[in-house]
Amino acid sequence: MKKVKIIMIVMLTGIFSLHIRAQSVSTGLDLVSTYVWRGTKLSGASIQPLLQFTKGGFSIGSWGSAGFDGFLEMDLFARYAFNFGLTAGLTNYYFPGTNYFDYSKDTGSHGYEINLGYNMQGFSVSANYMLNEAGGAKTAGGDKYFELGYTRKNISLFAGAGDGWHTPTGEFGVVNLGLSATKELLISETFRVPVKLSAILNPTTKQYYLTAGITL
């Protein structure tokens, strides 16, 4: 629990210190028909805001999802992108409705995950590892997720597998197979809206999703 508190303090301190000397501040807002994360449906139609501070290859910020069905998720993240395609980071998952300051194993509300990714000429691979067990966040500790992807022009293919909170039983399985396509929707001569469509199959839960999203 003490280690988890230290991680949280470091992340929050980083947000404020980077805010002071940030070279780039970016915001974003996505509207999605269904919130599907790593092959699992977490909520229906959702609004997903982003606030990010960037300095060189380092970025830190907060991302959230607010579903019209009441589902809420508010995350903190920090990551560094190296110039040879490697990205390393840490994500703090939090789901409002639980005590934000509860870091215990039985009822803790935060899940801390190490994130590694590598991209090269359209190919991508990522590995993620959950550091802690937290009953409130439903993490088992040691949860793993791996994903392979390939992007060509506006089409992306992906395949992901994981265990822990990624599957109903906690056993390792393929959970995220799919295809995404992006296109800019012309609203006027000066205004375009990026649109993303995704077809997602979860072989473990035997569920299929077709989702749509726009970025404002």
List each language-model region with its residue ranges.
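Repeated loop/turn-to-beta-strand initiation elements of outer-membrane beta-barrel proteins
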Residues: 25-27, 57-62, 84-89, 120-127, ...
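Surface-exposed loop and membrane-interface regions of Gram-negative outer-membrane beta-barrel proteins
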Residues: 4, 58-83, 87-104
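Short glycine/proline- and aromatic-enriched beta-strand/turn motifs that initiate or cap beta-hairpins
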Residues: 23-68, 128
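Outer-membrane beta-barrel "beta-signal"
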Residues: 118, 179-181, 185, 203-216
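Outer membrane beta-barrel transmembrane domains
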Residues: 156-187
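Cleavable N-terminal export/targeting peptides
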Residues: 1-24
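Hydrophobic, well-structured mid-protein blocks that either form specific transmembrane helices
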Residues: 85-140
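Solvent-exposed loop/turn segments connecting transmembrane beta-strands
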Residues: 37-45, 63-74, 101-110, 130-143, ...
